[in-house]
């Protein structure tokens, strides 16, 4: 790729990151103010506030990491890579909890276990969020340990031992990444499948009853599915692209690096837009802040 093409993708990446920082900063600020003012938030808004804050940090660290790598500041980049690992892991889990929360609250399954989860989920959200931070911390510690060992091995004069240890480190890092990303991803998929099945059952039941003018249950299903269906695409692409990068299936550290970064982070950037447009509080705050702004309905 020529320098001009690389420069274009650098500009696109910076603009995309700036938009994501503004979007997530806006969500975190609006919900954070309400959290402080009312001494609490509904469980769904609490997850969304934490998700917005984690994505704000994730995009900021991604920008720093990419420019530090371009400037060859590898030592400083290694420290920020540990922070990126923490925020990325936390972001995966916060996203999964939001999907599970939607599924539990909106779905209409009658199994006793499901009723028990529905009854407990709101009160369990603070502990789930704290657990996500703990998992992110453990992930960061594991990443820091691996980086330290890799740096020590780089100074080893025995090349046979060096190559064996580096091969082990790469295998360890890939397994670590897969464990931290794949588990929440499959929980997210399960939540969407259950929610879609619940909507299908609800629509089938409606065929045998007289249609109501305002079917709020169906509307709730459709609104959640619109948000989750779009994000299923974005979240899957983000997970797959990260997996490909870690597995080194494609060499993305060359001239195509910036194009790869644009595509990778595009998914979660677009999902932040969907979250703002599908949330009543966010739409209201946008309307107050920008009265002349035409906001499309979700």
Swiss-Prot record:
Record's keyword terms, sorted: G-protein coupled receptor, Glycoprotein, Membrane, Receptor, Sensory transduction, Taste, Transducer, Transmembrane, Transmembrane helix
Keyword Ion transport annotated: no
GO molecular function, one term: G protein-coupled receptor activity
Source organism, top-level taxon: Eukaryota
GO biological-process terms attached to the record: detection of chemical stimulus involved in sensory perception of bitter taste
Record's GO cellular component terms: membrane
Chief site of localization: membrane
Membrane topology: Multi-pass membrane protein
Entry keyword Transmembrane: yes
Extracellular side: 1-6, 77-96, 150-176, 251-257
Annotated TM spans: 7-27, 56-76, 97-117, 129-149, 177-197, 230-250, 258-278
Localisation: Membrane
Cytoplasmic side: 28-55, 118-128, 198-229, 279-298
Glycosylation sites: 158
Function: Putative taste receptor which may play a role in the perception of bitterness.
Note: Several bitter taste receptors are expressed in a single taste receptor cell.
Homology family: Belongs to the G-protein coupled receptor T2R family.
Protein name according to UniProt: Taste receptor type 2 member 134
Species this chain originates from: Mus musculus
């Amino acid at each position: 790729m020529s320098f001009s093409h690389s420069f274009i993708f650098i500009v696109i990446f910076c603009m995309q990151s700036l938009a994501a920082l503004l979007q997530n900063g806006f969500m975190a600020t609006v919900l954070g103010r309400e959290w402080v003012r009312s001494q609490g938030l509904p469980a769904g808004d609490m997850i969304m506030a934490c998700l917005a804050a984690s994505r704000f940090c994730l995009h900021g660290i991604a920008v720093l990491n990419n420019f530090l790598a371009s400037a060859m500041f590898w030592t400083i980049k290694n420290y920020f890579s540990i922070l990126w690992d923490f925020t990325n892991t936390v972001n995966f889990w916060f996203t999964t909890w939001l999907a599970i929360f939607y599924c539990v609250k909106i779905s209409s399954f009658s199994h006793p276990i499901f009723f028990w989860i529905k009854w407990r989920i709101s009160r369990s959200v603070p502990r789930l969020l704290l657990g996500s931070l703990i998992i992110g911390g453990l992930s960061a510690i594991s990443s820091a340990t691996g980086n330290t060992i890799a740096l020590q091995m780089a100074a080893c004069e025995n090349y046979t031992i060096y190559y064996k240890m580096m091969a082990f480190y790469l295998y360890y890092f890939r397994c670590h990444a897969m464990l931290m990303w794949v588990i929440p991803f499959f929980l997210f998929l399960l939540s969407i499948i259950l929610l879609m099945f619940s909507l299908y059952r609800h629509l089938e039941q409606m065929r045998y009853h007289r249609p109501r003018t305002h079917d709020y249950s169906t509307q709730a299903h459709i609104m959640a599915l619109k948000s989750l269906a779009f994000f299923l695409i974005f979240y899957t692409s983000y997970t797959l692209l990260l997996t490909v990068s870690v597995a080194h299936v494609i060499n993305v550290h060359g001239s195509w690096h910036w194009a790869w970064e644009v595509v990778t982070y595009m998914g979660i950037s677009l999902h932040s837009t969907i979250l703002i447009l599908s949330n009543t509080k966010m739409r209201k705050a946008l309307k107050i802040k920008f009265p002349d702004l035409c906001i499309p309905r979700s």
